[in-house]
Amino acid sequence: MLDVNFFDELRIGLATADDIRQWSYGEVKKPETINYRTLKPEKDGLFCEKIFGPTRDWECYCGKYKRVRFKGIICERCGVEVTRAKVRRERMGHIELAASVTHIWYFKGVPSRLGYLLDLAPKDLEKIIYFAAYVITSVNTEMRHNEMSTLEAEIGVERKQIADQRDADLEARAQKLEADLAELEQEGAKSDVRRKVKEGGEREMRQLRDRAQRELDKLDEIWETFTKLEPRQLIADELLYRELYDRFGEYFTGGMGAESIQALLQDFDINAEADQLRETIRSGKGQKKLRALKRLKVVAAFQATGNNPSGMVLNCVPVIPPDLRPMVQLDGGRFATSDLNDLYRRVINRNNRLKRLIDLGAPEIIVNNEKRMLQESVDALFDNGRRGRPVTGPGNRPLKSLSDLLKGKQGRFRQNLLGKRVDYSGRSVIVVGPQLKLHQCGLPKEMAVELFKPFVMKRLVDLNHAQNIKSAKRMVERQRPQVWDVLEEVIAEHPVLLNRAPTLHRLGIQAFEPQLVEGKAIQLHPLVCEAFNADFDGDQMAVHLPLSAEAQAEARILMLSSNNILSPASGRPLAMPRLDMVTGLYHLTRQLDGAKGEGQSFSSVGEAIMAFDRGGLDLQAKVKIRVRDLVPNAEQRPEDWEPGQPWLAETTLGRVWFNELLPEDYPFVNDLLPKKRQAAIVNDLAERYPMVTVAQTLDKLKDAGFHWATRSGVTVSISDVVVPPNKTEILDGYEAKADQVEKRYRRGALSYQERNAELVKVWTAAKDEVAEAMEANFPEDNSISMIVKSGAAGNMTQVVQLAGMRGLVSNPKGEYIPRPIKANFREGLSVLEYFISNHGARKGLADTALRTADSGYLTRRLVDVSQDVIVRETDCGTERGIRMPIAEKLPDGKLLRDAHVETSVYARTTAEDVTDSDGNVVLARGSDLGDPAIEKLLAAGVTKVKVRSVLTCESGVGVCAVCYGRSMATGKLVDVGEAVGIVAAQSIGEPGTQLTMRTFHQGGVAGDDITTGLPRVQELFEARVPKGKAPIADAPGRIRMEDNDRYWKITIIPDDGSEEIVYDKLSKRQRLAAISVDGTERQITDGDHVDVGQQLLEGAVDPHEVLRVMGPREAQLHLVREVQEVYRSQGVGIHDKHVEVIVRQMLRRVIIIDSGATEFLPGSPVERSQFEGENRRVVAEGGDPASGRPVLMGITKASLATESWLSAASFQETTRILTNAAIEGASDKLVGLKENVIIGKLIPAGTGINRYRNIQVQPTEEARAAAYAIPSYDDGYYTPDVFGTGTGAAVPLDDYDFGRDYR
């Protein structure tokens, strides 16, 4: 087999019949599979050993040769080669067809490639292929032209003969009629008898005339058809074709079925056709030009690749290896077989029957029918169900054809190539492990011994506990005591990977050092739950074991949980104290007035602790303590304080204890710490300290949090839910107000909608008042309020539902039900209240289920479009960048920090020197914008910064590190080789489930829903035209408005005096857009001035319009802004750079308008880098460059338009992409991740990128000298510890045997 790491591209093309015969090891002639008595394959059948190889290793069919020593011999009795049985997975056979058949992919795909090539409509093509019409394949025009007069004369003679015959017959009939009438007259017959005879005679004469006329018409038609006969002409009338053939057979050839298509293809002149089409495109207009463009795509593909078009018609069909379509015996003697075997059997049966019919010389009609059936059976084999009804197996199930094996989630690509199962894994339920360090996990002993079995066995043999591997295995299985000691030793420092499904982002798999635990549950560190989105209500996790040294190193350095504290999406810590820990730290840092020991002073922390232990001092009492090891913050710092000096802190003992958890030089924190403050401190630590310190501090915070949460006595009981005593009075007051509204409604003073709106107002106010009363009524030390105030769990609205009132609930449409639920959960709901509150809640659950599926599909498309965005170089050297605001100057001269600095400017690189108002450089070009740098800029009064962005990056492939900026997950400049595209896709997809599905009814837009949440994100990324789109101004100018009863009409009079731009029929259901004039907002009116790209109506703007009017940069920024809007509204912080990576992929292509001297086809999408490169080449050679316009592609379309056919085929529309790729002879350069995963190469990202793979070790001078010293070892084999102990000389690397070839 070819080693996968040694090829750089993969090409796909059309196979000709010769190729198929070359691959084949023999022809399959019989439909038999295996002999049901002997269970051995039948000779010449679908499982034949002679063709495909032996079923048992080194054994021929008849048993003459058995054993490996006969390797390679072909048995003279049965003809089977003696070799390994696994060749049955790679050897192919073939079926020689008795008649050609077309390949259904090329004839039936949309658009039909065969139809485009031959310029035949798919309908006509189908008629020809399935024997419903004849097609003319060639016409000898010269011979026809030369002999035209002779032929015409012959036809003339024939016409005359028919006319003469007709006249003679009519004459005879007329005479007979006269004689009959005369005879009747003599006999004196009645008049009606005479009339009848006369009418009968006339009728017969009419028939004679008609018959002759029909014959003449037929002659005319035949002659007419013959004179105009052209190749590729269809003749549906069989009689007409027969007549033509009988009369003029030597002047043309024709036929039906795939053979005639093959004849057409063989005579087809690709170059001439291509030139003609190019001419049509140059000179043509409208439909003609469009059709020529589409045809040229197919024709040019054949021209460029030199593929032979007759490969689209098959004379033989390949048979895939039998072990890929196995047949297995079930209990009870029945067989289960792959559907392919049934499909192949139908082909072989029909083919054999056709051969027999042809040999017997059967009539044409019967043979044609059999040929049609053969065509249909080959169609079903390739793509069952593409044409007509699918072939079904038992139970009416459509059989799975070759195409179905590749398609969809269960197809080869997605099931087996992109997602493989791994050995060395286990799974179990998780429980919390509060005693673990951040980088540890608890692994159940039994699971560990199974996972590490080979390691344990080897070590048992090394330590002479066992004689050989077999006895070591027995020891492990019997769980002898020595096994546990060895296991401890083996797992030390050997990380394992833990994964929790669904793995929505890269933190869903992290590495830990295992600690052996009793029981059967995996223990997980509480701080990594957030990243895994895990809880301990029965979640399960999988364990995987990295085996090779490289894998272990990567797991330890890149994936260890203590190195993954920051979120790759926002760059902020994910490992935060949560739940109990928050409560504990909150309790620890509270300060209570009047607590025991308040106002005392202590000479040292130790003294205070002693007082606390004796019960003389409360944890939360305000005291003064002399501290030595802590650093005072700005407020507490004495005038002349030097580091290391003691100072007097006015604080509580709890806060001193808290500060002892933080790094030594961290300024003293003297505040109450709810969750937000704790998060800010962890954030600050992550910005200022190395990861190791942060991890250690987090562990200390976790331990302290649990310790003090236990001692805080926070518990929840029903008596903690205190209902405010004045609740009924409050509600009675509002009940009266509601009655007033009802009265006004009954009197007709309010409409139904107004009444509802009024009631909603009344009851919302009631709920707020009850909530205030409830908060005021809660005791200071109430557990529930403590949990909420500390930010550990829950929020005030939930407490209001528990202790205040449930309030208004909405129905599934999202409208409020105007009757409130007055009860709370403490008092209990009535049946009606319970029912209406359930109504909306159930909708919420159904919504979540739908959202999960939608969000998963969005992530998949995002990954697909961005998978080949990898950091390929450190700096692309571009001067371009994007200006971003970091602050706004207020009228009083103060700076107001921009709300979105966190997600826009933070973690980027400056694109130019940043100067203050005096021109002093505050930050040099290329500086990293972390929190300290941004603080510095704000202090210097800077409001806008020009930053590097992936949108302006000029790297040809992927992006460069400086344009991307800081990697959010490490806090440093991103490494070359980082797969930033996939990180971006995960960061956007992972919070997808949190986005709402609902479309909100917004006031003012009657009946029009404004799309928000997940559907809006999809609409943006797919670049769809939004529902109710808002027009934008094409040019700056004044506007003139006209107002009809149903529509607005807006006209823009451009400033530059060009012609007016009219926007007609703008629906009045959309309000006019707001503009701000002199700081006040109002709607646009007649005579206002608008800028280019300004919205004229409210609603969403069409991104394609933005691209057309404002250009690509604005379109990109617009998409980033709009996507961020949705995520921010849900409180999700994702950095802009992730959205930018995706948007960059959407605008990578240019549509060719005019191809100039290049090879591009007009109307085809081309990668921008390719377009620019080709233009440079053409201009250098003195030709005209191509012109094109940027085009915005949705992510699905962009994925399918990727250069890599492997990646596109494994995404969607597999057959269409493979069809196209084969015609174009597409070659996959294997640059993205997916292509390499599919063929099993290391991915070109991270440690697999070329510049890391091609590193060579250069020995130092000393090592070189030592290499030739006399070695001090006896045997030729060195144990690995030789290297560590310094015995002997350095080992020459060239001689050292690593067990496999690393070079």
Swiss-Prot record:
Biological process GO annotation list?
Answer: DNA-templated transcription
Instruction: Enumerate the residues binding Mg(2+).
Output: 535, 537, 539
Q: Name one GO molecular function term.
A: DNA-directed RNA polymerase activity
What keywords is this UniProt entry annotated with?
Answer: DNA-directed RNA polymerase, Magnesium, Metal-binding, Nucleotidyltransferase, Transcription, Transferase, Zinc
* Pfam families the record matches: RNA_pol_Rpb1_1 (PF04997), RNA_pol_Rpb1_2 (PF00623), RNA_pol_Rpb1_3 (PF04983), RNA_pol_Rpb1_4 (PF05000), RNA_pol_Rpb1_5 (PF04998)
Q: Where does Zn(2+) 2 bind?
A: 876, 953, 960, 963
Q: Which reaction does this enzyme catalyse, per its entry?
A: RNA(n) + a ribonucleoside 5'-triphosphate = RNA(n+1) + diphosphate
Q: Please state the Enzyme Commission number of this protein.
A: 2.7.7.6
Looking up Gene3D superfamilies in the UniProt record yields: 1.10.132.30, 1.10.150.390, 1.10.1790.20, 1.10.40.90, 2.40.40.20, 2.40.50.100, RNA polymerase II, clamp domain, RNA polymerase Rpb1, domain 3
Q: Name one GO cellular component term.
A: DNA-directed RNA polymerase complex
Write down the required cofactor(s).
Mg(2+); Zn(2+)
Residues annotated as binding Zn(2+) 1:
60, 62, 75, 78
Q: Which InterPro entries match?
A: DNA-dir_RpoC_beta_prime (IPR045867), DNA-dir_RpoC_beta_prime_bact (IPR012754), RNA_pol_asu (IPR000722), RNA_pol_N (IPR006592), RNA_pol_Rpb1_1 (IPR007080), RNA_pol_Rpb1_3 (IPR007066), RNA_pol_Rpb1_3_sf (IPR042102), RNA_pol_Rpb1_4 (IPR007083)
Write down how the cofactor binds this protein: Binds 1 Mg(2+) ion per subunit.
What is the stated purpose of this protein? DNA-dependent RNA polymerase catalyzes the transcription of DNA into RNA using the four ribonucleoside triphosphates as substrates.
Subunit info here reads: The RNAP catalytic core consists of 2 alpha, 1 beta, 1 beta' and 1 omega subunit. When a sigma factor is associated with the core the holoenzyme is formed, which can initiate transcription.
Family indicated by similarity: Belongs to the RNA polymerase beta' chain family.
> What is the name of this protein?
DNA-directed RNA polymerase subunit beta'
Q: Which organism is it from?
A: Saccharopolyspora erythraea (strain ATCC 11635 / DSM 40517 / JCM 4748 / NBRC 13426 / NCIMB 8594 / NRRL 2338)
What's the gene? rpoC
